Amino acid sequence: MSLSLDFNWRYVYLIAIGLKFVLALSNSYIHPDEHFQSFEVLTNKIFSFTTTTPWEFSSDTPARSFGPLYLFYAPLLYSIKLVGYELSPLQIWYMARLQNVLIGWVITDMCIYRLLPTKPERIKGLFYTSTSYITLVYQSHCFSNSIETWLVLICVLVINDLRFIQESNVPELQSQRQYQKLFWFGALVSIGIFNRITFPAFLALPSLYLMKYFRHNKMSAIFSLLGFMLPTIAIILLDTFEFNGSIDDILKHPLDFNSYVITPLNNLIYNSKVENLSNHGLHPYYTHLLVNLPQILGPGLFFMVSNFKNQYWKTTPFLAVISGVSVLSLIPHQELRFLIPIVPLVCCCFDLKNISSASKGERITKAPPMVSVLMNLWYLFNILLAVLMGVYHQGGIVPALDYFHSNIFQENSRQSVQIWWRTYSPPPWILGDKLDTLQVLTVTDDSPQFELDSSKSNYLIDAMGSDYTHVSKLIESFKDFSGSIYLIAPIASIRKHYDISMHQVWNYTHHLDLDHIDFSDFQSLKPGLGIYELL
């Protein structure tokens, strides 16, 4: 069934490409990890910015690796540093997101083109993938999940190629050696595991075909293992150096494995304990299937499982989807972003024939009513979610930090206190503090006490979602402070809770706080983030 029924798919595809770049330059903030597990770590090392190191990089058993960060983001940052052109942190952030758009665009389109056998299938896969809000928004953000998506796609493509060779009846094709391809496959699997420990989940079922291929081509398994081991050893040595300061202990006692820092192993051990996962939130085992998957696909679910049939159920992409969702559903901590690698694979498996009333072989010149309805719902769903998650979701935090970067930290002429309330944790690297004048503190209702470092001149206090009475006491504690005191909060929260003397010095309209919406009070739905200077 052709996609070019009631519209020209090329126009929509080209518009989607443009939207990728537009949304990459928007300021939405989806999850703290997109800052704190990437640029919060790297900019401290490369630009000497004052940052906060997340627990994954600061505990005695580090759970995140430097390897993927240096591989995917450090070349950009070092290039900026070597050129010597002074870019603001905001501009650096934009460049990183544009880089992600370009990498994701090339890898995704190339893999889908090669995964699917015919032109109509390729058009369908590319069309739905490019118009999904996950592709438009999430893939430009600096998550480890974005990198995972690219690596999963390439690995699924390699396995699919090997499967095709096994199932073909062409002796010339079966006799071809795949050593180079499998070497790089092993390397990508290694990088994928160091990037996210969840990576193998998406390859569990497809790897049955890989094992079958290895059984008949044992030398290929050796090349794949070699490709896996080389980056594994390199990244372990890199992490050991970064976290321990040297690799002297390894050189002296190479067989003492306690000297090695193996971050995926530490991550696996940490996440295997429910008490650790409870610190991040526990979810029912059905959350991915019944909550996250519908939020990701929306009307696309009907393209996937209409009439409980799908002609693609034996394909490698379908097996990767089932594998990823099933394995990740066994883990009691289930966030939506964990499933974003399945999106291009799911779109390859959309089965429009199941919702078409046309008989086999009948030429379709006009889209059936149900298809037209679902297509319009698909557009509406993805446009709304792209605007919500790509523009408004916590969209004022980074611009507000950029305001302080421009007006306080570049000049370094005055003292300041920033009290952030009812926002995601502000990533300090955006402030671009190179003079070590900043102290970052976190206060909560359960832990309201803090101690200021008198050697610092600027303070960033993350009050998180504290009760407004505690925030008022926090503000009161700075009554004798000689510098400027700022409260940064959603405009709706300020209007509801505060009538103290303050002056709004800056505001950003495209900001929405979804965590403190009170549906009994429509004022809480008012978007906007403000910076208020206390008088």
Curated annotation (Swiss-Prot):
Residues annotated as transmembrane: 11-31, 92-112, 142-162, 182-202, 221-241, 285-305, 312-332, 338-358, 371-391
Matches recorded under Pfam families: Glyco_transf_22
EC number: 2.4.1.-
Entries under InterPro entries matching the protein: GPI_mannosylTrfase
EC class (word): transferase
Record GO biological process: GPI anchor biosynthetic process
Pathways per UniProt: Glycolipid biosynthesis; glycosylphosphatidylinositol-anchor biosynthesis
Cytoplasmic compartment segments: 1-10, 113-141, 203-220, 306-311, 359-370
Protein name stated in the entry: GPI mannosyltransferase 4
